[in-house]
Amino acid sequence: MSSLEISNSCFSPETRSPSSRQSVEDNASEPSGKDVDDVQEKPKDIIQFTAEKLSVGEVSQLVVSPLCGAVSLFVGTTRNNFEGKKVISLEYEAYVPMAENEIRKICNDIRQKWPVRHIAVFHRLGLVPVSEASTVIAVSSAHRAASLEAVSYAIDSLKAKVPIWKKEIYEESTSSWKRNKECFWAAGD
């Protein structure tokens, strides 16, 4: 059984230090000179939607564990072009309660398929400029195969099942809402 932390805000300056992330750290026991076999740590699923810039390093640190030898990441960023048009930013919208619920289901699926320890899924909302991260998924596991496969499954499932919409904003002052061809509700269009 895993604990779940869901937040609609990102790291504020007050929460940047590890000691101030109590809600996350309270779920894990810190090793204090004990034998590695004595370390007790509850698995965590951390889901967050935010309008703030994502820190890949901070998200990856949330899943680090003394019980794990691997942390695998997926980082989705805004690229500067689409079909010959210059993209200046993306704008994301989501139905957050449903999106959180769908991501929770994805985390549960991952735990049924792979022996992973912690899962973090962070997604930006609002404007995301070129080269900035819109999605960060981090998974820790004892060995790399499980976390690598879980991260791949997580992003594929997120794109297929989670109600998040993306608008591309182009340099020539036009924009276009993009249909996600992978999502189940758009199939057959």
UniProtKB/Swiss-Prot annotation:
Signal peptide from the UniProt entry: none
Source organism, top-level taxon: Eukaryota
Catalytic activity: 2 [molybdopterin-synthase sulfur-carrier protein]-C-terminal-Gly-aminoethanethioate + cyclic pyranopterin phosphate + H2O = molybdopterin + 2 [molybdopterin-synthase sulfur-carrier protein]-C-terminal Gly-Gly + 2 H(+)
Pathway given in the UniProt record: Cofactor biosynthesis; molybdopterin biosynthesis
Entry's localization field: Cytoplasm, Cytosol
InterPro entries: MoaE_sf, MOCS2B_euk, Mopterin_biosynth_MoaE
Modified residues (Phosphoserine): S20
E.C. numbers: 2.8.1.12
Keywords: Cytoplasm, Molybdenum cofactor biosynthesis, Phosphoprotein, Transferase
The keyword Transferase is annotated on this UniProt entry: yes
Role this protein plays: Catalytic subunit of the molybdopterin synthase complex, a complex that catalyzes the conversion of precursor Z into molybdopterin. Acts by mediating the incorporation of 2 sulfur atoms from thiocarboxylated MOCS2A into precursor Z to generate a dithiolene group.
Entry similarity comment: Belongs to the MoaE family. MOCS2B subfamily.
Protein name per UniProt: Molybdopterin synthase catalytic subunit
Organism: Mus musculus
